[in-house]
Amino acid sequence: HFQNYSSTKEGSLYSISLWGNRIPKGVNKDFVLSTTKSEVSFFSQNISISKGQGNTRNRTGSFSTSFGSKNVFTYPHETGNTMLFPLLILLLFTFFIGFIGIPFDNRTMDNGIVRLTILSKWLIPSINFTQESSNFSINSYEFITNAISSVSLAILGLFIAYIFYGSAYSFFQNLDLQNSFYKGSPKKNFFYQVKKKIYSWSYNRGYIDIFYSX
């Protein structure tokens, strides 16, 4: 005698996209450990039950359960490797040029006062730079201050991009931060109308990745 103990609970859930539109959560993740599509069988065994003398009945017990479909937030697709690799190459060149172009204190030469950089200090032999250590520390402090502000803005941009374009199984996707901005009456919000106009204008215009994915 076979019995299946399973229950499936599915609902029509919707999510609000970046532009305020309702999008059905259509990403399904089915956990299947056996040939059954909607059920997972844990074990099955034969149970021998004796009744009286010589009266034996074999029962096959099947224990199974079902994992419902997991609905996740629909998020924009990530940039492919065709865009990632050129950006990494440009990053290396930008980092190298920015490193060798850090300005340091002035040094008097035969042609006048020349603004030295790390590259010029590598190429020009130095005689004595110990007398200018105080000016060097001042310029280094200014450089570090500017670098901290620019790097902080870059990290903030990466954090925002990770929230919108990150993995569907990340911690921020479980918090559902995007829908929290549209609670209440989003259609009456001015920013909602602005984003809707921008989206209608930039659809198939502002995205360059579509040319690489085709």
Swiss-Prot record:
It comes from Brachypodium pinnatum. Its EC number is 7.1.1.-. It is a multi-pass membrane protein. One of its GO terms (cellular component) is chloroplast thylakoid membrane. This is NAD(P)H-quinone oxidoreductase subunit 5, chloroplastic. GO terms for molecular function: NADH dehydrogenase (ubiquinone) activity; quinone binding. Pfam families: Proton_antipo_C. NDH is composed of at least 16 different subunits, 5 of which are encoded in the nucleus. It comes from the Eukaryota. Belongs to the complex I subunit 5 family. The lineage of its organism: Eukaryota, Viridiplantae, Streptophyta, Embryophyta, Tracheophyta. NDH shuttles electrons from NAD(P)H:plastoquinone, via FMN and iron-sulfur (Fe-S) centers, to quinones in the photosynthetic chain and possibly in a chloroplast respiratory chain. The immediate electron acceptor for the enzyme in this species is believed to be plastoquinone. Couples the redox reaction to proton translocation, and thus conserves the redox energy in a proton gradient. It catalyses: a plastoquinone + NADH + (n+1) H(+)(in) = a plastoquinol + NAD(+) + n H(+)(out); a plastoquinone + NADPH + (n+1) H(+)(in) = a plastoquinol + NADP(+) + n H(+)(out). The chain crosses the membrane at residues 84-104, 152-172. GO terms for biological process: ATP synthesis coupled electron transport; electron transport coupled proton transport. It is an enzyme of class 7 (translocase).
